[in-house]
Amino acid sequence: TMNNTAECHDDHSLDKYLFPFVYSIVMMISIPINCISLCASCVQVRKKNELAVYIFSLSLADLLYALILPLWIDYAWNGDDWRRSALLCQISAFLMYMNFYTSTAFLACISVNRYLALVHPLKLQHLRTRRFSLIVSIIVWILESILNSVILVNKEVFNDPCNFTNHTLCYDNYPLEWWQSWINLLRICLGYLIPLIIILVCYHKIYQVVRCNQATLDEEKQKVKKLILNITVTFIICFTPYHIVLFIRSIKEPYTKDLQLLQLLYKVYRITQALTSLNCIADPILYCFVSETARTDILNLLRCCLCLQKHEEDHARDHALCSSATKSSALITYRASCEAEI
């Protein structure tokens, strides 16, 4: 911890405005589009589409994270002061890291699936079945839960090192202790570097095969190039800045007493952490690129929703007209009876 609070001038004003702004936008967009993606992928899973299993898992991870964003907005708005229970802090941090690393894992699974479909369409077909995809998805969820369970068994609320602020930090304390640094380095290797290498190797092989295949139409080649570009760019933009800063923090913080460096690293780290939330928006959009029937499924779902809404509006209007007509009829009958009495 930082002993010399006289030199400690921590400022949480950046977090107070950055996170609520970014997270609010992410939440408003990602919740509806991930719900649509879940429904569309569920339809495809029933049709024995193995790729849809990975898309479903990806959308589920994004939706769970988007649903806890209000807690992180509240935390940032209060100047990085956690005012909820310690257990809720653990659950929120657990779901956040589950989203980070299930997302990278399932993006790697999608890349391998596309590699097998385009480079080895006739070989290894048993690896492109719905059953195999379900098994892989379950294994990913179990492994990620085990790797991130350290969050659920350790204390995750800390007093702000700048003691005069009297803030309670949730999960991301600073400076990092040596054991936290080792866990972070393990996360970087297993959750970031390995999926990144898999994605780059798969798409390099896919690009080579598609480019050299004379039978592939130019339009199909462009689709494959868009797919490669979108998944690679999404992965790099959302996760690379965060993991670079996390790596620097992990090798520097346990062994330095430079307060200014510690605070600078923490601020940059928090900015890159906000950037990772954009994957909740990007992942469902990728669904339109990796599945040929995705756009059709999503459009059908939207039409269905619009039809239901229109039906409800028509029903409400008919009910209002019927009610109005009934009242008018009753009024006419009443007037007629009054005139008869006169």
Question: Predicted regions span which residues?
Answer:
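Extracellular N-terminal segment of 7TM GPCRs
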Residues: T1-I36, Y174-P175, N184
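Intracellular effector-coupling site of seven-transmembrane GPCRs
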Residues: T165-E177, I188-G191, Y207-I244, L262-L265
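Extracellular TM2-ECL1-early TM3 structural module of rhodopsin-like
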Residues: D15-S24, E50-C109, A117, Q125
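Hydrophobic alpha-helical segments of membrane proteins
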Residues: L67, I146-V153, L193-L200, I231-I248, ...
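Class A GPCR helix-loop hinge within the 7TM core
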Residues: F100-I138, F289-E292
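Intrinsically disordered regulatory tails of 7TM GPCRs
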Residues: T1-D10, D160-C162, D218, D258, ...
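Internal alpha-helical transmembrane segments of multi-pass membrane proteins, especially GPCRs
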Residues: F56-S59, F100, L134-I138, L190, ...
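Loop architecture of class A 7-transmembrane GPCRs
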Residues: N3-D10, A76-Y97, H126, R131-S137, ...
